[in-house]
Amino acid sequence: MLRVLTSTLRFPRPWKPLETRGCSSNPGAAGREIQVCALAGPNQGIAEILMNRPSARNALGNVFVSQLLEALAQLREDRQVRVLIFRSGVKGVFCAGADLKEREQMSEAEVGLFVQRLRGLMTEIAAFPAPTIAAMDGFALGGGLELALACDLRVAASSAVMGLIETTRGLLPGAGGTQRLPRCLGVALAKELIFTGRRLSGAQAQALGLVNHAVAQNEEGNAAYHRARALAQEILPQAPIAVRLSKVAIDRGIEVDIASGMAIEGICYAQNIPTRDRLEGMAAFREKRLPRFVGE
């Protein structure tokens, strides 16, 4: 059993640092629908994916999806990334969901292939090695909510509007919504929300457990982003390998029976034993000082 579990688990692997960091260092970034930012100073270790397609309210079109996959592949190889935030550069919108105007021009075969690609995108987000946070400062509908559901943590403005509304358009959630929403809220409630296509405010979503935090919106329209940053800053000082292995243990363990889940936890724990960070944590405790984790 342990051998089978070990062969199927995806553990964090060594990463290569990016040659270029920060949005301003890329002169072509301004015209892109997806921009990658690496924060500096006390926020070093926090990376951001900025979704910026104002003409279509960050709808999930072909170019948008391609650039998002490219950004994830880039960040996955960066060992300096300890937390990844998904945010919007379009005021009042997180992600409006699928680009239905673009999809209307597709053949039935093309639609099937594109939705399969969307499903793969959400899987890549869910499998990202470091913790991910969705900062939902506005509408997150259909695929937009599916994107947020693929993240580990969600923060929303109280006034944000979200829902899996596909049934109101003659569709059903096709990018993970039918699977991740029940795992988040339970089967009966997920069915009710999907069958009715109901929209929820950020405050309602928090009451149901769909988002971790709901905050009052500010004049700039980025209150959820600031709360997401504060949450990321809480994660930053913790041992990055232990955090990533905790993510693996939770994500894989929740899919199996508890005995298999305990075995997965044991495998993850064994991976952490030889790390320098574990020794540093014990030394810091003994010496009554804050630990300095380096991710090794």
UniProtKB/Swiss-Prot annotation:
Modified residues (N6-acetyllysine): K101
Record-linked PROSITE patterns: ENOYL_COA_HYDRATASE
UniProt-annotated location(s): Mitochondrion
Gene Ontology cellular component list: mitochondrion
UniProt-annotated site: Important for catalytic activity, residues: E146, E166
CDD domains: crotonase-like (cd06558)
GO molecular function: lyase activity
UniProt keyword Lyase present: yes
Positions carrying N6-succinyllysine: K101
Record-level GO BP terms: fatty acid beta-oxidation
UniProt keyword Phosphoprotein, yes or no: no
UniProt keyword list: Acetylation, Fatty acid metabolism, Lipid metabolism, Lyase, Mitochondrion, Transit peptide
Family classification: Belongs to the enoyl-CoA hydratase/isomerase family.
Protein name, per record: Enoyl-CoA hydratase domain-containing protein 2, mitochondrial
